[in-house]
């Protein structure tokens, strides 16, 4: 019996040792296989095998529960997980394929830009970036002409394809937006923005473009981004308004050109980050974005403290740091913290807003002309300040930090409103769907005196106005959002 017990004890000990060795072997094998899997994925990853790779990754994550891991093992596994997550973030998914159509307007009026260093740098940057995606490239005028090695042809000034005497922007834009809508893809158009008015009537330009866009926007929420850039132009400019025989004008100067992007919100956001990043584009000037409606409504709160505040009020709900209704409102005389020259007999406060999900450029959000406020009350908007510009030692900055930490939010802007009369009621602040001021300033009705003119483009404002109206009509709404506040005695 004792001999049997001894054998049993020895047998159990051997099993334990064996299990420990097997476990150690399995763990080493697991870590080696996991690392090989991640390396292989980094080197050979494409969207077609995404789901298969993701399933394998999940298996590895599930398996780690089988082992007793040291702190070093945990760090190794966390590092491998992070590497794989980075691959997912930077690779288009099978479920949401990301393809790109690149359209280069090749009318004769584009030839002058091919001498410009800034223009060529932008083309190299953008066309180079789209090579990381499924893509097709086209020269476009009144038809599209698919091209291989389009960058090489642009660089060698070999862009004469099709009818280069005329550009049909209705066709170009409709074609681009339809391509983006059909496959949840991105369309990029490069153009000089000059609208060819064959019948001489510039007033019908916005109507034609609006109608073309309305058809394309009917069933999709495609967005449009317009970028204005500048480059050297050396060559012949073809005027739309000069008399026959005087339309071809030799110039050597800077001229604006434009890049338009079409796609849904997520596609546009990614494109502006990875493909057409404006910080990497020499000659970039301005940006506008057109959309039917916001993906989400912004959050906002009245600031109970800060340099913006003149007068007295309390939150309607006691103990709240996040509120849109105030009571016990009183005007105040001058304050050493007050903004503006006339600080007597004034009531004023700031509203912190999170515009981060609106998709609209800062230049649009910070333009006072794009806002309206309840006319029946006596308030006006004094200022729209970016949070990044708030002084770090100010009372406003401290108040913002307190609210953000307590409510797990991050604001982007402060809207300051002020009134001397009609203080009480329901105050509405609306962000309207306006044509950005820079677009209005970029258009001209006379391009005959083109020498020395480096900022305007014939009928460009009319062209973009048509796009803007199409988006307004799709949503049947003249504003993007409304901030609602209640102010009581």
Which residues fall in each region the model found?
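Short beta-strand-loop
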Residues: 33, 40-61, 135-160
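Von Willebrand factor
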Residues: 143-186, 195-196, 223, 230
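Extended non-globular C-terminal regions
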Residues: 311-489
């Amino acid at each position: 019996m004792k001999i049997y017990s001894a054998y049993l004890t020895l047998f159990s000990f051997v099993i334990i040792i064996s299990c420990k060795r097997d476990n150690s072997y399995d763990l080493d094998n697991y870590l080696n296989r996991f690392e090989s899997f991640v390396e292989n994925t980094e080197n050979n990853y494409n969207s077609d095998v995404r789901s298969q790779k993701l399933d394998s990754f999940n298996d590895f994550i599930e398996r780690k529960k089988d082992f007793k891991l040291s702190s070093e093992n945990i760090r190794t596994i966390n590092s491998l997980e992070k590497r794989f997550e980075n691959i997912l973030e930077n690779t288009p998914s099978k479920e949401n394929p990301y393809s790109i159509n690149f359209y280069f307007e090749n009318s004769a009026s584009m030839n002058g830009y091919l001498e410009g260093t800034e223009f060529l740098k932008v083309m190299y940057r953008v066309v180079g970036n789209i090579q990381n995606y499924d893509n097709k490239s086209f020269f476009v005028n009144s038809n599209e002409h698919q091209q291989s090695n389009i960058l090489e042809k642009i660089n060698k000034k070999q862009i004469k394809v099709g009818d280069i005497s005329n550009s049909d922007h209705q066709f170009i834009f409709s074609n681009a937006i339809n391509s983006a809508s059909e496959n949840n893809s991105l369309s990029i158009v490069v153009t000089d923005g000059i609208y060819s008015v064959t019948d001489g009537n510039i007033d019908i330009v916005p109507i034609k473009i609006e109608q073309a866009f309305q058809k394309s926007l009917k069933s999709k929420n495609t967005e449009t981004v317009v970028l204005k850039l500048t480059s050297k132009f050396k060559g012949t400019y073809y005027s739309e308004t000069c008399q026959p025989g005087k339309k071809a004008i030799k110039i050597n100067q800077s001229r604006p050109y434009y890049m338009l992007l079409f796609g849904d919100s997520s596609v546009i956001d990614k494109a502006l980050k990875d493909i057409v990043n404006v910080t990497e584009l020499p000659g970039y000037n301005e940006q506008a974005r057109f959309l039917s409606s916001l993906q989400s409504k912004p959050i906002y709160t009245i600031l109970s403290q800060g340099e913006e505040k003149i007068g007295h009020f309390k939150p309607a709900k006691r103990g709240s740091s996040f509120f849109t209704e105030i009571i016990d409102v009183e005007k105040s005389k001058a304050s050493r913290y007050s903004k503006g020259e006339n600080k007597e007999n004034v009531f004023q406060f700031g509203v912190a807003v999170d515009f981060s999900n609106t998709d609209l450029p800062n230049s649009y959000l910070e333009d006072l002309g794009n806002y309206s406020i309840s006319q029946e009350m006596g308030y006006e908007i004094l200022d729209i300040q970016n949070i990044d510009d708030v002084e770090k030692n100010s009372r406003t900055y401290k108040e913002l930090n307190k609210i953000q930490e307590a409510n797990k939010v991050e604001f982007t802007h402060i809207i300051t409103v002020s009134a001397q009369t009609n203080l009480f009621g329901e105050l509405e602040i609306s962000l309207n769907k306006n044509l950005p001021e820079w677009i209005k300033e970029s258009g001209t009705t006379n391009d005959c005196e083109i020498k020395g003119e480096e900022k305007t483009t014939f009928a460009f404002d009319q062209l973009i106005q048509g796009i803007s109206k199409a988006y307004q009509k799709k949503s049947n709404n003249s504003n993007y959002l409304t901030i609602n506040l209640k102010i009581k005695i």
